[in-house]
Amino acid sequence: MMAHELPLSIHTKKSNHNVPPSKAPSAKTNKHKPSKSGSDDRGLPNGGKVDFGNKSGSQTNKKSNKKTSKHTSSNTSNNKGVTRVLPDGSKPNFGNESSHQNGGNHKKQNNEPCLPNGEKPNFGEGSKSHSKKKNNDHVLPNGEKPNFFNEKSSKKATKPKEKKPLITEDTYAGSSFHSSPAALNLPKPSFKTSPKTNDAKQHTTEPNYHVNPQVNTPPQHSVNVPPQHPVTTYPAGNGVPNIPTVPSNPTAFPPRNHYAQPGFSYYATPQGYINYQYPQVPPPPPPQGGVYPMVAPQYQQQPQQHPQQHPQPQPQPQQLPQQHRPHHLPAIAAPQQGHRISFNELLGSSKS
């Protein structure tokens, strides 16, 4: 079945009928009826009359305001008679007291807030003099005044800068040097060669000027005269050989510069040998048989002797002991009877 096809009971009992209650008189019924008394006037919760913008309403509003002012004044008068006290015995301050003293104290307290340490805070609203005093009061532990770099420099403190005169003359590189009077006394540059170099060139170009060839090359036939007291060096512990202090007509070649050694006269051969020249000694008297013993030829190597072992005397021409002869160098026997030979003859004899 559909909803509209539901059966409806037509016959109902009288007990089931609900009688609606009597309606209270609505505002619509009383709308056009005049108000009987002023007690029906509507008012605000504080007792004031509602003003709907009508003239009559404005007049009634003034009356209601007067009534409310009277009501509040009566309440305050009643409150004055009753003194309220806090549990600690002090009088409470609700902020609505009209006494001049209390109001002045309250204003002072509000206008002068204090920090916990008792100082007055500075919110930047104080006068300039007050802020300057506070800045002057700050002092570092060492007694110096702190500098926060927030103070504006006064115009009086700054000195006016002196204006330098502008140079209007034409300037160029070196103008300051040329304009100075001391520059005139300086010597003028000359591009000529110095006289020393000219003299040196003249000496070299002269025909009489010649270079000594013996400066760079060692002389071969010059005689080197040893000093009277030659200085010799010997290693420690070796015996000093007995050498006559005054040699008789020694003939030796001068050594080279890098072979120079004090107390010795020697020369170097092209083969690289160094020959020491010993002073000439007269030969000993001939033996009884009239025959001299055999003499070792020149440049013949002899067994090397220790410097401490002195040679034993033999019936042959006396020879001086070896004076620190370098190793690998031949011993040279003195020529018989003081015979002199040249360097070329010496080379020829060595080749033969």
Curated annotation (Swiss-Prot):
Biological processes annotated in GO: mRNA processing; nuclear-transcribed mRNA catabolic process, nonsense-mediated decay
GO MF terms, alphabetically ordered: RNA binding
Keyword Glycosyltransferase: no
Polar residues: compositionally biased ranges: 93-104, 205-225
Residue stretches of biased makeup (Low complexity): 71-80, 289-309
Keyword line: Cytoplasm, mRNA processing, Nonsense-mediated mRNA decay, RNA-binding
Protein name (record): Enhancer of mRNA-decapping protein 1
